[in-house]
Regions:
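Structured catalytic cores of enzymes that bind and process phosphorylated ligands/cofactors
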Residues: 21, 39-43, 71-93, 115, ...
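ATP-binding pocket architecture of kinase catalytic cores
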Residues: 3-111
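Short strand-connecting beta-turns/loops that link adjacent beta-strands
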Residues: 47, 167-169, 219
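Short, low-complexity, intrinsically disordered N-terminal peptides in bacterial proteins
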Residues: 1-7, 246-249
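A conserved long alpha-helix in the C-terminal portion of kinase-like catalytic domains
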Residues: 24, 36-41, 123-140, 178-179, ...
Length: 249
């Protein structure tokens, strides 16, 4: 469990080097942010421990959510060198929850997403053969399509618990930062019901058809949860795969 003082939060992750990966991710995100206060400040970090500035207490609001959406869009626009690229100064994998994941730069988003994010977790999760076949068919459909998207600088694990609303507005914590599709962060926010989600999307300027594509961007976190949290995520993963196939025609 994180240790909290009046001004800081100290974490010692179980995974070796996870603290360093998180610290480099936070610094990279802060460098790309329009307002550095949108990203938790790293006070100090080592291979085993990370200390961040504690987020001052606050409550979400519609206006704060719209501002957070705008800041997220600006962060994404700051870009990344490639899909899957880790933050500068970090060559290793990153971590989503307790799960380690590959970060090998590639020019093709679909290849990166399918081969480094969805299938590695889906194939290890305890889902049925029929469910795995459905996920693989969804991945084949993703890979078969040409995607007009440039690498964005993304948080990579932006569920509601990693977008805090303090007294100064929205603040992101605990990233799995890498170069990715910008809507990946939107899909994660939608997965577990972020407060004022509609306002976040409004501030972000999300496309009108974003709901159609949300399930595709949830394949990765649902596959991770099916592996790390068990069978309660099997059906949601199955539904997301089916919705992805429907969206891709």
């Amino acid at each position: 469990m994180p240790q909290m003082s009046r001004d800081t939060v100290t974490k010692r992750p179980a995974q070796r080097l996870a603290a360093r990966a998180e610290a480099e991710g936070l610094r990279w995100l802060a460098d790309g942010a329009h307002e550095r206060s949108f990203v938790a400040e790293v006070v100090e970090a080592s291979d085993e421990e990370i200390v961040t500035r504690r987020v001052p207490a606050g409550r979400p609001s519609a206006e704060a959510a719209r501002t957070a959406g705008r800041e997220l869009a600006r962060l994404h626009d700051s870009g990344a060198e490639a899909f899957g690229c880790p933050p500068p100064g970090w060559d290793g994998p990153n971590y989503i929850g307790t799960a380690e994941q590959e970060c090998t730069p590639t020019d093709d988003w679909a290849e990166f997403y399918v081969e480094q994010r969805v299938l590695p977790f889906a194939e290890l999760a305890g889902i049925s053969s029929a469910q795995l076949d459905l996920v693989r068919r969804a991945c084949d459909a993703i890979a078969a399509r040409s995607w007009d998207v440039v690498p964005a600088r993304i948080h990579g694990d932006l569920w509601a618990g990693n977008l805090l609303f303090g007294s100064d507005g929205g603040i992101m914590i605990d990233p799995a930062a890498h170069g990715g599709h910008p809507h990946t962060d939107l899909g994660m926010l939608a997965l577990f019901g972020a407060p004022y989600l509609e306002e976040i999307f409004q501030g972000y300027g999300a496309p009108k058809d974003i709901e159609k594509w949300i399930p595709m961007h949830q394949l990765h976190p649902l596959a991770v949860h099916a592996l790390t949290h068990g069978a309660s995520y099997n059906r949601p993963l199955e539904r997301a795969a089916a919705a992805t196939l429907e969206a891709l025609g």
